[in-house]
Amino acid sequence: MKTSKKRPAKNKLPQDLATFRDRYVELFGMLPALPAARFEFSGDINPEFLALSERLRAHAFYSDVFDVKITQLILFGMLLVEHHPAAQMHAIAARRAGASWEELHKVAELASVTGSLAPANQGSAILKDVRDKESSV
């Protein structure tokens, strides 16, 4: 039988991890399912890794460069381009941080243009390269 170091009681997180968890509730108005599972499981199995990953997240999400609204708009667009379901949670967080429907829609417009023009840009570059090689022989 494998023994492991003593862990905190289930759902009892150290204060630093509880503070990180509470930031999700501030942003989203709730603790989303994926972070909730991460806090429960990683908090039990490897709280050090959870703390490291949450410090990395906090460093990126909360800065003196972008305010919370802009950060959430950027994350919404990035996740939208990736077709990631978490885009919805970041749209909610952006609204809670003061984003207008127009701002969110503009981000969706930018994401759709980025996604649809990428094949046109790449295709044109490939075809130009092929044409240039053909004309040089």
Question: Which functions belong to the PLM regions below?
Answer:
Residues 45-55, 85-97:
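Acidic-glycine-rich active-site phosphate/pyrophosphate-binding loop
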